[in-house]
Regions:
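Radical SAM enzyme [4Fe-4S]-AdoMet core and its adjacent flexible, acidic
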Residues: 8-11, 76, 109, 145-298, ...
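A structural signal for short hydrophobic/aromatic patches embedded in well-ordered alpha helices
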Residues: 70-71, 99, 166, 219, ...
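Conserved alpha-helical substructure of the radical SAM core
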Residues: 2-142, 147-149
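Intrinsic-disorder-associated interaction segments
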Residues: 2, 11, 130-133, 252-259, ...
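Generic domain-boundary/flexible-linker signal
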Residues: 55-58, 93, 121-123, 162-164, ...
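N-terminal pre-core extensions flanking Radical SAM catalytic domains
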Residues: 1-56, 282-289, 299-301, 309-314, ...
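Short, solvent-exposed turn/loop segments enriched in Gly/Ser/Thr/Pro and often Arg
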Residues: 88, 236, 354
């Protein structure tokens, strides 16, 4: 028996729910990745959003009302969860709490990707939430705790200098803000253990690079031992992740070999300590996120970016990743049914969809997952 549910509420789709249908036979749209706002005071060099995607000057950004209409359409298609990915840090959007409250009123769980600086600083929490009467970070975190939310906190390193490199602000007191945010979220119980229930707190060690790859196992262990989900993976192949991918190619041999060792070490430890069962690993294989839930959102949802484009997922941003040009111009049900992700929803015997973007671009189709799978099984025999 595992010690906890190896997932975070609102992200991984369970075997019982994946490939499920509506009463009319349509495969359910169970989850959405979505951009909500573009403001961000950080300058992460690996950001999966290109700089031009954070520029609203074109005037075609989705409004709050348009976003709510999309959610209402998705609810009719079976929507249960939303992940707010960007385009900026969602907690820098003054309408953020209204959006989360709207989702909660529809019984939709919201996963919030954030670097934590707003939740770690009273002045920043007040700055973006004055209209709600919130004056400090604790009140903001309490409000989120009382709503249907999970917090996915950016966490690339235990080391201050390394972490500051990942947010691009060497003179900013970000590291201490992040530490304060993590402490606060733990104090409020986002990671409290509940029988047969996933946690509501995650550490997102993404991307990992050669500069922090030697810390990833320790971050994973630190999180799991506190009932905190941990998701680590290489760079996306989107936005400024393209330049990261180019750098990885220059370091190909070292990065590839260290990644194999990292994934293997995490899985062996997770299996030996009851966080992943041997049976599940043998059946499901290696996840994009080592030791974490299988990545399968591409068979249950879509990604809607700030200007209305509908994408396959956040991992790619090329023309072949665009499902539809503007979600405002066509019913969401039609977009969903016509999408390649809907075809994946019909692959009823498949659970693990790994990550085509990273496997192809970063690992050059070198059977990365199968190599890790074999090494893990050899180590745990």
């Amino acid at each position: 028996m595992t010690k906890n549910i190896n997932n975070i509420i609102g992200w991984g789709i369970s075997k019982e729910k994946l490939h499920s249908k509506l009463s009319d036979g349509t495969y359910k749209l169970q989850t959405l990745d979505i951009d909500f706002g573009t403001k961000c005071s950080l300058h992460c060099p690996h950001c999966f959003k290109s700089k031009f995607n954070q520029n609203e000057s074109k005037g075609n950004a989705l409004t709050f009302d348009e976003t709510k209409k999309i959610i209402l359409q998705a609810k009719e298609l079976g929507l249960e969860s939303i992940k707010i990915l960007g385009a900026g840090d969602p907690l820098e959007n003054e309408d953020f709490l209204d959006f989360v409250k709207f989702n909660s009123s529809l019984d939709i769980h919201t996963c919030v990707f954030t670097k934590g600086h707003i939740l770690g600083n009273d002045e920043l929490a007040k700055k973006y939430n004055q209209k709600y009467g919130i004056t400090n970070a604790r009140d903001l975190a309490k409000e989120l705790y009382n709503l249907k939310t999970s917090i996915l906190l950016g966490f690339n390193s235990f080391k201050e200098d390394t972490q500051l490199d990942f947010v691009g602000l060497p003179k900013f007191d970000y590291y201490n803000y992040r530490e304060s945010a993590l402490k606060l979220l733990i104090e409020l119980g986002f990671n409290s253990f509940k029988e047969n229930t996933a946690t509501r707190l995650a550490l997102i060690c993404a991307p990992y690079k050669l500069s922090n790859i030697d810390e990833v196992f320790d971050i994973y262990k630190f999180g799991k031992e506190q009932n905190i989900y941990v998701a680590a993976c290489p760079s996306t192949v989107s936005g400024m992740g393209h330049s990261e991918q180019e750098q990885i190619q220059k370091q190909k041999g070292e990065f590839y070999n260290k990644s194999i060792d990292l994934y293997t070490k995490i899985y062996v430890w997770a299996i030996n300590n009851g966080y992943v069962t041997k049976e599940d690993f043998e059946k499901d294989g290696v996840s994009l996120y080592p030791g974490a839930h299988i990545c399968n959102q591409v068979a249950a949802g879509l990604y809607i970016i700030w200007d209305g484009k509908v994408m396959v997922c956040p991992g790619l941003d090329g023309a072949d990743a665009i499902v539809y040009e503007d979600v405002r111009k066509k019913p969401l049900k039609e977009i969903w049914i016509d999408s390649p992700n809907y075809q994946r929803a019909g692959m009823i015997d498949k659970f693990n969809f790994q990550c085509v973007a990273r496997e192809k671009e970063l690992f050059n189709n070198d059977n990365f997952y199968s190599i890790v799978y074999k090494k893990v099984l050899e180590a745990i025999q």
